[in-house]
């Protein structure tokens, strides 16, 4: 599986875990992006947008289902912690 994109060497374990999901058959297609202090440090994508279909692209649009609930909860907890 060819992994596309960029990854700061300090975040090599993120790339390794991302690639490992494909090697273990856990992913058909995926992307991951991480910023640190507003600077992109990981921007990776690989696989297929639909199994047996078009390759995943940097701008492939996906349904994130209920991920917003988790992000909202984490945001509220961080704000509460900061007072």
Question: What does each of the following model-derived ranges do?
Answer:
Residues 52-83:
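Active-site-proximal loop and beta-strand segments within enzyme catalytic domains
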Residues 4-64:
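Short, conserved catalytic-motif segment at the N-terminal edge
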């Amino acid at each position: 599986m060819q992994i596309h994109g960029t990854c700061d060497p300090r975040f090599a374990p993120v790339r390794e875990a991302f690639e490992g999901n494909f090697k273990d058959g856990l992913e058909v297609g995926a992307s991951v992006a991480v910023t640190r202090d507003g600077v992109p440090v990981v921007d990776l994508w690989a696989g297929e947008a639909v199994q047996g279909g078009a390759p995943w692209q940097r701008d492939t649009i996906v349904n994130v289902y209920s991920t917003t609930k988790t992000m909202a909860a984490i945001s509220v907890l961080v704000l509460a912690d900061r007072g």
